[in-house]
Amino acid sequence: MSMMLSNWALSPRYVGQRNLIHCTTLFHTLTRWAKDADDKYHDINSMYENMFTPSNDNVSILQDEGKSDYDTTKTSSMQEDISAFNKDLYNFYNIGYAKQIMSASQLENIVKAKGRFVIQSLSTSPYYNLALENYVFKNTPRAKRGPDNCRLLFYINDRCAVIGKNQNLWQEVDLAKLKSKNFELLRRFSGGGTVLHDLGNVNYSYLTSREKFETKFFNKMIIKWLNSLNPELRLDLNERGDIIQDGFKISGSAYKIAGGKAYHHATMLLNADLEQFSGLLEPSLPNNMEWESSGVHSVKSKIKNVGIITPNQFIAVVSERFQKTFKVDGEIPIYYCDEFKSINDEIKDAMNTLQSEQWKYFSGPKFSVKIKDKGLTIKVEKGMIYDCDRNDLIGLEFKGFLENIDSYT
């Protein structure tokens, strides 16, 4: 793996991966791969499974405790067709199920036991992925002696804007533009600023003990690993600990420390649709509003894609280097999760919290806003107006007030 990244990216294994990503005719691509398939392509071929993973609309999950398979009595005909097609592909081409997805009980046993591992989520649901990350963090045991239980998690989210736990969302995002471009809004469980995700962005989360935690450590490792593959990448670290390339930010970070453990999670812009990001972090608010908030304010930065690395290549490289660098006793395994099998009540509860309007709009810091030309000052806590120059506004939801501001002012 000491060769230049440009050569590494053209190896047969990764050319196949890139062809898969850019293919226009799925069946012809599958056929071409099947003819050349052997054991060394098995991991690449397994990526076909992701293409046929059903959406939440097409799957009903068994709710009974101890069960983790699909409820065949409630499964839609579309899901049955997808499953049948996957099985046909597997039987004919010997591909499709190489990535063994953990059941809920397997996930619980692995996370709550001591040891180091890598988890890759095959889901693109931001609600599931953030809930999974939270589950792994909360349930990782503290090492009383010996090596700490450091873990690495990867996930790729569909379009979404993710604000920090302690941010005033109305100062961070344009809700109307998010809706028009089909971006979900999430408030995560950690601090930090607002970031935008799509399928061209990889999120990684490094978990370790509080004693071993250092905010810039893992990004330094990322830079070292990627630059060693291709020095032309010229990745560097800025004073905030973000990864930059040619002065442009390609990775943003956030952190959480609790219960003697800590994690650093970050984005990596690889081939994101940056055009779609335009304007989403520029709230369309009246110019006569003056804000005061104790919350965290995002730092605006120029961004770009790394460009010559695909998401799957990035995950493969960082996983391999993590396995080699953090190996203690035995190999560090890689596990796979999705929102259909690798889910339990704790993850579901976290997903419900993330999806709730209460968490999105009625949490966050206290703030006040002055409407200058109206001589009006409004104070807000937990999304509710609790103090104002006009008594008739006290007790209103700030969200509703802002959506109908002309009628109130």
Swiss-Prot record:
GO CC aspect terms: mitochondrion
- Residues in domain BPL/LPL catalytic? 146-330
Give me the residues that bind ATP, please.
188, 193-196, 249
- InterPro entries per UniProt: aa-tRNA-synth_II/BPL/LPL, BPL_LPL_catalytic, LipoylTrfase_LipoateP_Ligase
EC code(s) of this entry? 6.3.1.20
Q: Enumerate the Gene Ontology biological process terms.
A: protein modification process
Domain of life (superkingdom): Eukaryota
Alphabetical list of PROSITE patterns matching this protein? BPL_LPL_CATALYTIC
Q: What is this protein called?
A: Putative lipoate-protein ligase A
Q: What is the lineage of its organism?
A: Eukaryota, Fungi, Dikarya, Ascomycota, Saccharomycotina
Give the gene symbol: AIM22
